[in-house]
Amino acid sequence: MISFNKQSGDFMKTLKILILSLATVFAFNSFVLADTVTVTGVAYGTTLTTEQTVLPDGNTLVRNTNHSIWVQEGLPEGFPNKLSAHCQDMSLRSPEFANLGITWSCIATDVDGDGFINVGGDPNPDLSGCFYKSVAGWGKYAGVTRSGKCAFGGNISADGSDWSLTWSGDFTTP
């Protein structure tokens, strides 16, 4: 009897260790499920309103609202590759209209009504420091982080009201 109880005790101890080990594996596995992919994209936009204020120092404060369609590649399954975005930007321009700093915020939504708030900017006169980052999301974008580099893609219309912006960066799901 004593040896049976000892075996039973050893078995229970082994079973507890096995259960604890499996629970640990599942807990760590949930951390591993977060996935980061590189996405690229192009925004095709139209400036809807522009307000320019010449300041006493000769610089110009520019405020724009725009609408753009974002076409992306490299997204994880379940995330549509097209988004509709409503954005606002503010920039300070020199008397020669060189960029002295620009910042923007966008609300981007997909066909399901899910979306996120994206912000970005560029402090460089040649627009070489363009960056973006998501700050909040809802629906399938809740907990998703996006960040990367962007570049002005050029004007599409002669008056500059239609334009493109390209980007590449990380898209991390929770």
Predicted regions span which residues?
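Short, Lys/Arg-enriched N-terminal segments with co-localized hydrophobic residues
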Residues: M1-F11
